């Protein structure tokens, strides 16, 4: 969900058996339709994407929080553009660890934290009587031209944040090492038998005004006392970075959060985790949290209408134009 604003030029295969070149200036309605269109209008068979030189190294930081309000405020500060349009960090994500699974979760974070680090974090959480711990993960890219100043720049950013005192962990890594970080986490999970198992993931986009309610009800409620295998990812996004003419739908607020509960099923608990996911969604529904599921799957037309909201009528019109026989992606039960 991290992308730049450089123009993409998809080549989409439609149900008419055509390959259509499209962009913001050419066949723009198809261009917008296929982006987040769940395969309903065409299949992107080729894309032209502008590239730029990659950095060589980065400062890779993980910052520890025991208070959600402080954590989310710092995250939102970091995604706000500065006066010159730049951002404090090159990359930003976040994670939550519920207390019951805190030590195990930190140890499975791709080897980033040492055993001593884990012990220190667990002790601080206990001292704060924290039911959850939150981590901001961020990088600051640099190359030979900026190597002499990168530490000073990083320190100036960290001074603006309110993480737990003394609990900023920084690695100096090659850019390739950072990009390959998930592979390290995969290897760690594979060693303990948690990779080649079912993964009942739940991905939702939560309005910024309701993320504290989500935290209290889910991280501080439903997931408390459970054994969690897999990362709980949470970070804010600027709606201004999303083109609202695309089929993709997001909450109608300037800032919303991507929350990815990336569970791994162990000990034959798949059904339990699926039921837990439904419990989380029911909580959001009852609390009136206007979330949107990412990669949603509904079986009732009314749920799809609710999901697309104000984009539904346009979605139907484009379906009639580009796939009138309803041949593409019938398994999603949107039109079938």
List where the protein language model places each region.
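C-terminal substrate-binding/cap subdomain adjacent to the FAD-binding core in PCMH-type
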Residues: 8-204, 208
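Extended C-terminal subregions enriched in glycine
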Residues: 206-211, 257-258, 263-286
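Activity-critical C-terminal alpha-helical subdomain
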Residues: 182-194, 200, 285-336
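Glycine-rich N-terminal segment of FAD-binding domains in flavoprotein oxidoreductases
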Residues: 1
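A short glycine-rich, hydrophobically flanked beta-strand micro-motif that places a catalytic Asp/Glu
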Residues: 90-97, 227-245, 290-297
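Generic non-transmembrane alpha-helical segments
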Residues: 74-82, 156-164, 213-226, 279-289
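Extended, charge-rich low-complexity interaction segments
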Residues: 121-138, 201, 265-271, 320-335
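C-terminal structural cap/anchor segments
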Residues: 204, 209-259
């Amino acid at each position: 969900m991290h992308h730049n604003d450089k123009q993409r030029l998809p080549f989409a295969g439609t149900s008419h058996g055509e390959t259509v070149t499209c962009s913001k200036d050419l066949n723009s309605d198809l261009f917008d339709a296929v982006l987040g269109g769940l395969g309903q209008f065409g299949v992107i068979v080729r894309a032209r994407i502008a590239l730029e030189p990659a950095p060589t190294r980065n400062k890779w930081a993980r910052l520890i929080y025991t208070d959600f309000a402080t954590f989310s405020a710092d995250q939102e500060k970091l995604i706000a553009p500065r006066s010159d349009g730049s951002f404090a960090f090159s990359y930003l994500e976040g994670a939550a660890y519920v207390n019951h699974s805190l030590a195990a979760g930190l140890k499975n974070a791709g080897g980033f934290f040492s055993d001593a680090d884990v012990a220190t974090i667990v002790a601080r959480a206990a001292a704060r009587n924290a039911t959850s711990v939150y981590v901001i993960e961020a990088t600051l890219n640099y190359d030979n031209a900026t190597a002499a100043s990168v530490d000073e720049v990083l320190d100036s950013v960290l001074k603006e944040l309110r993480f737990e005192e003394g609990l900023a962990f920084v690695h100096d890594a090659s850019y390739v090492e950072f990009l390959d970080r998930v592979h390290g986490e995969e290897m760690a999970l594979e060693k303990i038998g948690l990779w080649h198992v079912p993964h009942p993931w739940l991905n939702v986009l939560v309005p910024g005004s309701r993320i504290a309610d989500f935290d209290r009800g889910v991280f501080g409620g439903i997931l408390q006392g459970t054994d969690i295998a897999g990362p709980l990812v949470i970070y804010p996004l600027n709606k201004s970075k999303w083109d609202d003419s695309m089929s993709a739908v997001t909450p109608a607020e300037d800032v919303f959060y991507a929350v990815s509960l990336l569970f791994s099923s162990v000990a034959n608990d798949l059904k339990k985790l699926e039921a837990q996911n439904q419990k989380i969604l029911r909580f959001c529904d009852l609390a009136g949290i206007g979330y949107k599921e990412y990669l949603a799957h509904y079986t009732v037309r009314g749920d799809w209408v609710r999901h697309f909201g104000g984009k539904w009528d346009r979605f139907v019109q484009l379906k009639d134009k580009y796939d009138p026989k309803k041949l593409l992606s019938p398994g999603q039960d949107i039109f079938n």
